[in-house]
């Protein structure tokens, strides 16, 4: 299963992508802001190719489980440049609740930032989730991650508030910002 807008393509991960994940995971911004601050099933960045391979296997297992459940909870896409196929980052569904509320997340490798890939990936993913019946799609951002805030806003998400001391990073509390989109008011239908 792939999604594309002719600029970015979202596709399942393959074992050949492990080196990219391991390299990107060394980026300080990914380490800082991709922590499992409040996401169920959101993995910490892997620190080796072997750990990245194991994570890709976990991604594949999540796809199989989601197919059996009939909704994409825990599925993860590789973000790639549609023309070249170059890997750019990750986006996915962290959780799909019984109430059809869906949490998503994303990150980009340093070399892919500033090209609009994250915004396009979030729009593609959100559109697909609404087509599948999501009643609400939300994302959480560790306070201070301004580039991610800009992605959320450009992708049509509305800031709903900051939960103070909601998450934990390196044994310290951190504030978490909440953004959401509803199918009734989302601007990128």
Segments (PLM) and residue ranges:
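GNAT-family acyltransferases
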Residues: 1-111, 172-189
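Conserved GNAT acetyl-CoA-binding A-motif
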Residues: 131-141
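Conserved beta-strand edge residues that scaffold enzyme active sites
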Residues: 39, 143-144, 166
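Conserved hydrophobic/aromatic "anchor" residues
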Residues: 13, 77, 128-130, 157
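Conserved catalytic-core motifs of GNAT/GCN5-like acyltransferases
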Residues: 138-140, 158-176
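A generic structured-segment signal
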Residues: 90, 101-103, 118-126, 130, ...
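Conserved acetyl-CoA-binding loop-helix of GNAT-fold acetyltransferases
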Residues: 106-108, 114-131, 146-154
């Amino acid at each position: 299963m792939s999604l594309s807008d002719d600029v970015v393509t979202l596709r399942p991960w393959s074992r050949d992508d492990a080196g990219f994940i391991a390299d990107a995971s060394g980026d300080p911004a990914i380490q800082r802001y991709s922590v499992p601050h409040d996401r169920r099933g959101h993995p910490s960045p892997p620190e080796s190719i072997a750990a990245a391979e194991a994570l890709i296997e976990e991604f594949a297992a999540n796809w199989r489980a989601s197919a059996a459940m009939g909704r994409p909870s825990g599925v993860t896409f590789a973000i790639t440049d549609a023309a070249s196929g170059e890997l750019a980052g990750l986006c996915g569904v962290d959780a799909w609740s019984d109430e059809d509320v869906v949490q998503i997340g994303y990150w980009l490798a340093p070399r892919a930032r500033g090209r609009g890939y994250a915004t396009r990936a979030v729009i593609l993913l959100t559109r697909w989730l609404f087509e599948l019946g999501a009643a609400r799609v939300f994302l959480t951002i560790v306070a201070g991650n301004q580039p991610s805030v800009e992605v959320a806003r450009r992708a049509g998400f509305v800031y709903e508030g900051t939960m103070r001391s909601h998450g934990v990073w390196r044994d310290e509390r951190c504030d978490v910002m909440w953004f959401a989109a509803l199918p009734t008011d989302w601007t990128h239908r």
